[in-house]
C-alpha cells in the first residue's frame, strides 16, 4: 500500500495512504480541516489542490464545473495518488476526539406537532467534550442520522437535540411514534467544524438559521453569553426563519448588550414581523458585511443563497461558516 505526504500552505503536513480520504487522514493525524457530513454532499470540506493527483471515491455532484476546473475537490471524497499540496491551512484548534458510546433517552418533550426535544443520558464514566455548534450521529439498527447539540456545555452528562419529523424520514417513525425514556441507543461524536471563531477584525456576528438549524446557533449564542469577552464591542444579529409561528419553538434569552433578534416567517398571513427569507431580511439591516462573520445552519437552499448574496455585499469567503442539513 502506498503512502503519500499531504502538505498544507502553513507548512504543516501529514501522511495519507492510497485508500484513505485526505480528510479522514488529516483528522487521524490531529490536523483539523473543515468538514461536516463525510458524504460528499455539503461542501464544507471543499479545498483546492495546488499540486498533486487525487482520485474520487464516489461520483461527486456538489462542485460546479468551474470549481473542478480550478482544482477544487471535496477532501472527504478524494484519495491521494501522489504527494499533494493543498491551498488551505489547518484550523489551529484541537478538535475533541469523537467517540462511540451508548446512551439512553432521558426524556422527550413535544415542542410542536412536528418537533421534539430529546434529552440523552450518557454513561456516568463518559467524559464528553464538544465545541458549541458540533453535532452527533445517533446509531440505531446499524443506521445513523446526524443531529446538532442545542446547548453549549454537557451538564449532568446529558445532551439535548431538536428533532423534526420528516415524512419518510429514516428515524422519524422512531422518534415520533416509538421512542420512550430509557431506550438504549448508540452515539458517535462530537463531529463537524461548525463552531465560533474569535476574529478580532470582525465587528459583527450574524447568525442565520432555518427550522431546527437553530440548534447549533443556540449553542453558539449560549457560548457568547457565557464568555462576553469574546464579543466586546461586537454587534450580534440572529435571524431565525420558519414558515408558520409554530416553527419558532424557542425564544432566545440573552443579556448581551448589542444583540438583535429578528424572527422571520414566510407563510404566516397574520404575521406582523419580518416576512420572507432570513438571508434577504439580513440584507435589509445596517450590517457592515466587509467586517462581519456569518454562521448559517439549515437548508441547503438557504445556505447557498446566503453565501452568494452576502458575498456580493462584501462578506469575505473565509468569514462564512455553514452547516447544511443534507
Question: What are these language model-derived features?
Answer:
Residues 50-53, 89, 141, 190:
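Short, surface-exposed secondary-structure boundary micro-motifs
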Residues 15, 36, 79, 129, ...:
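Residue-level "contact hotspot" at macromolecular interaction interfaces
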Residues 157-158, 163-326:
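FNR/FR-type flavoprotein reductase catalytic core
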Residues 97-184, 202-203, 242-244, 265-268:
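Ferredoxin-reductase
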Residues 61-94, 102-111:
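Short Fe-S-cluster ligation motifs
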Amino acid at each position: 500500500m502506498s503512502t503519500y505526504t499531504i502538505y498544507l500552505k502553513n507548512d504543516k503536513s501529514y501522511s495519507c495512504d492510497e485508500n484513505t480520504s485526505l480528510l479522514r487522514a488529516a483528522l487521524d493525524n490531529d490536523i483539523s480541516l473543515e468538514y461536516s457530513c463525510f458524504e460528499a454532499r455539503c461542501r464544507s470540506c471543499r479545498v483546492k489542490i495546488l499540486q498533486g493527483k487525487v482520485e474520487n471515491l464516489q461520483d461527486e455532484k456538489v462542485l460546479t464545473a468551474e470549481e473542478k476546473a480550478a482544482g477544487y475537490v471535496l477532501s472527504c471524497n478524494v484519495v491521494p495518488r501522489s504527494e499533494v499540496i493543498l491551498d488551505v491551512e489547518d484550523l489551529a484548534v484541537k478538535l475533541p476526539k469523537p467517540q462511540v458510546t451508548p446512551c439512553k433517552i432521558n426524556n422527550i418533550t413535544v415542542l410542536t406537532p412536528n418537533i421534539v426535544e430529546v434529552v440523552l443520558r450518557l454513561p456516568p464514566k463518559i467524559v464528553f467534550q464538544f465545541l458549541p455548534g458540533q453535532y452527533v450521529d445517533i446509531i440505531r439498527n446499524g443506521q445513523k442520522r446526524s443531529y446538532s447539540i442545542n446547548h453549549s456545555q454537557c451538564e449532568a452528562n446529558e445532551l439535548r437535540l431538536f428533532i423534526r419529523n420528516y415524512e419518510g424520514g429514516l428515524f422519524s417513525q422512531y422518534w415520533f411514534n416509538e421512542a420512550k425514556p430509557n431506550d438504549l441507543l448508540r452515539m458517535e461524536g462530537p463531529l463537524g467544524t461548525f463552531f465560533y471563531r474569535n476574529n478580532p477584525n470582525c465587528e459583527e456576528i450574524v447568525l442565520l438559521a432555518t427550522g431546527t438549524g437553530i440548534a447549533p446557533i443556540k449553542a453558539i449564542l449560549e457560548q457568547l453569553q457565557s464568555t462576553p469577552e469574546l464579543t466586546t464591542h461586537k454587534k450580534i444579529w440572529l435571524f431565525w426563519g420558519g414558515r408558520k409561528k409554530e416553527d419558532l419553538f424557542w425564544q432566545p434569552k440573552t443579556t448581551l448588550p448589542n444583540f438583535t433578534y429578528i424572527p422571520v416567517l414566510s407563510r404566516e398571513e397574520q404575521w406582523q414581523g419580518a416576512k420572507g427569507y432570513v438571508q434577504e431580511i439580513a440584507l435589509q439591516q445596517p450590517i457592515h458585511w466587509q467586517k462581519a462573520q456569518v454562521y448559517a445552519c439549515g437548508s441547503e437552499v438557504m445556505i447557498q443563497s446566503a453565501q452568494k448574496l452576502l458575498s456580493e455585499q462584501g462578506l469575505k469567503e473565509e468569514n462564512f461558516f455553514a452547516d447544511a442539513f443534507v
